[in-house]
């Protein structure tokens, strides 16, 4: 498989009290999954924008690991990178870093998200029941 040309998306957010559970006050895992999905979707959008495959939906989230928790006030930086490209699917690897209030950083999470490209995001199939092929030249260039 060819190397994918530096298609990345960075998503940053701060942990607020409503993002945490009550004991101890650490971020909900569901909040982290949601933010990972947002980062991955941004990466796919950047890769497929202005193409017939411009609509994509998340179909699977795999290999998720939470290494440490996050507290109120921490800055989380999610970096999404395209790791595999199929005919109608895109795999995105997301890695999260926690930046403490004192500026120190540590890995917080990672996972893979699979997207499929669709004609209409409200109806995940085309008229003949097939998904939209991804124009690889948009992602790999013309070389």
Where are these regions (language model features)?
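Hot-dog-fold acyl-thioester-processing enzymes
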Residues: 1-58, 116-143
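Preference for bulky hydrophobic residues occupying beta-strand positions
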Residues: 13, 59, 64, 94-96, ...
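Hydrophobic beta-strand-centered segment that forms part of the acyl-chain substrate-binding groove
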Residues: 40-79, 83-91, 104-111
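HotDog/MaoC-like acyl-thioester-processing domains
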Residues: 71-72, 83-143
């Amino acid at each position: 498989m060819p190397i994918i040309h530096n298609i990345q998306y960075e998503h940053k957010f701060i942990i607020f009290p409503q993002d945490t559970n009550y004991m101890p006050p650490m971020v909900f895992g569901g909040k982290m999954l949601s933010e990972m999905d947002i980062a991955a979707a941004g990466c796919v959008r950047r890769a497929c924008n202005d193409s017939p495959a411009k609509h994509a939906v998340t179909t699977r989230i795999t290999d998720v690991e939470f290494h440490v928790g996050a507290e109120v006030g921490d800055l989380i930086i999610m970096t999404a990178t395209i790791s595999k490209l199929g005919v109608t699917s895109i795999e995105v690897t997301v890695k999260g870093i926690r930046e403490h209030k004192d500026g120190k950083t540590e890995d917080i999470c990672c996972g893979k998200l699979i997207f499929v490209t669709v004609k209409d995001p409200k109806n995940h199939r085309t008229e003949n029941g097939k998904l939209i092929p991804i124009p690889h030249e948009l992602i790999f260039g013309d070389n």
